């Protein structure tokens, strides 16, 4: 809703800020729905370009998390709000403590993977150039370095799982505020989930058909188009299977870009949800597995971006790179899910499998991958193969079709 221009006012209740009179001001890169500036490296002001009437999710969530003492986010200091002549309130900006950081987890992951691949390339070239007696030693050293690099990557991805789990536990705690606490999924929630998946999947399949017509045959696209009705029915069944699941407030737009890397720990930011969605929908309690799906897809995306990136390799070098990326993807996804499940104290299943509701998680993974197809079709068609592969993978799992097994491959070519 637009804020009326007449008879409006903006009220500010002074709050002491730890700022020097000559504190430096730094504008950060503009995001989709907001612009931010850092003042004195102690305060960050987020200005919303999409002003909406009523309770703003970012303000509501950060205020609640600050009140209950959730540590791994930027604490709320205050807000700048507009109030119309009729008493309708709109948040124009929020003021938060600044978290000193080394950047977001998306950039960190890209840099980490790129560095690891470059180092592997140097080592494998040395192996190829070495004599027969030295080759086994060089191979052993290369494998050790790769294992150490993987351990470092998994340590931080595991921290994200822990912090997200702690966030969900905090948001599920009993509260005097009815906007928080938990609920139970009912038929309306299942219908809502089904409708969202139907909306995204239908559009995605239409985009894929058009993309294939312009780019030539693609086996994944052919298969997905042939399974349209079966996928929609499988999504409906998964949504109904979620009846009785716990609901709560969630982050709502969780991915690696919403995580700050700070002194080796993970800080979660940007709680406004998907900006294009209606505010009431963003504030609705839903399954926390929606956030989990967002991060799982983001882990896949960063690997896809590495394959899609400017590094042009071919032949054995490409095969080694792809094996390494697949190993990192499989291991990081498993570590994230394990640490998340441990943080929420999810009871293990009888067969020792993942303690989370994987059927419901797959529903949200399907929706997220379809959303990504729609986004790339509209904005970056050359990136569309990344979500296409993810959509085909989760769709095959939903329909119990043949899915290539995830194998921990040695990037140097032999068994791990």
For each predicted feature, which ranges?
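Conserved ATP-binding subdomain of kinase catalytic cores across diverse folds
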Residues: 1-210, 256, 262-354
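An alpha-helical support segment within catalytic cores of ATP-dependent transferases
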Residues: 7-23, 204-249
């Amino acid at each position: 809703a637009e804020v009326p221009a007449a008879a409006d006012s903006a009220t500010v209740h002074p709050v002491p800020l730890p700022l020097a009179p000559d504190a430096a001001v730094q504008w950060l890169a503009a995001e989709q729905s907001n612009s931010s500036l850092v003042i004195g490296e102690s305060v960050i002001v987020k200005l919303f370009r999409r002003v909406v009437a009523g309770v703003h999710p970012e303000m509501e969530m950060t205020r609640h998390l600050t009140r209950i003492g959730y540590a791994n986010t930027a604490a709320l200091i205050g807000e700048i709000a507009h109030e119309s002549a009729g008493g309708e309130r709109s948040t124009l900006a929020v003021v938060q403590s600044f978290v000193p950081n080394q950047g977001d987890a998306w950039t960190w992951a890209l840099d980490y993977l790129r560095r690891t691949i470059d180092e592997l390339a140097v080592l494998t070239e040395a192996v190829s150039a070495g004599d027969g007696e030295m080759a086994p030693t060089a191979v052993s050293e290369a494998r050790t370095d790769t294992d150490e690099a993987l351990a470092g990557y998994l340590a931080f991805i595991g921290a994200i799982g822990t912090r997200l789990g702690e966030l969900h536990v905090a948001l599920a705690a009993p509260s005097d505020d009815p906007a928080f606490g938990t609920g139970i999924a009912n038929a309306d929630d299942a219908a809502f989930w089904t409708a969202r998946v139907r909306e995204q999947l239908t559009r995605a399949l239409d985009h894929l058909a058009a993309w294939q017509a312009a780019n030539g045959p693609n086996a994944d696209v052919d298969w997905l188009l042939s399974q349209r009705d079966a996928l929609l029915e499988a999504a409906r069944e998964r949504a109904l299977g979620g009846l009785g699941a716990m609901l709560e407030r969630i982050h709502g737009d969780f991915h690696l870009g919403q995580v700050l890397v700070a002194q080796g720990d993970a800080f979660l930011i940007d709680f406004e949800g998907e900006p294009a969605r209606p505010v009431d929908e963003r504030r609705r309690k839903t399954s926390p597995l929606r956030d989990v799906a967002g991060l799982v897809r983001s882990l896949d995306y960063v690997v896809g971006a590495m394959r899609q990136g400017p590094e042009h390799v071919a032949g054995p070098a490409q095969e080694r790179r792809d094996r390494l990326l697949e190993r990192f993807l499989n291991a990081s996804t498993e570590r994230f899910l394990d640490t998340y499940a441990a943080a929420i104290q999810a009871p293990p299943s009888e067969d020792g499998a993942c303690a989370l509701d994987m059927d419901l998680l797959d529903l949200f993974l399907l929706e997220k991958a379809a959303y990504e197809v729609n986004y790339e079709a509209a904005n970056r068609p050359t990136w569309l193969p990344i979500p296409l592969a993810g959509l085909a993978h989760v769709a095959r799992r939903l329909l119990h079709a043949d899915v290539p097994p995830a194998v921990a491959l040695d990037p140097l070519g032999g068994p791990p």
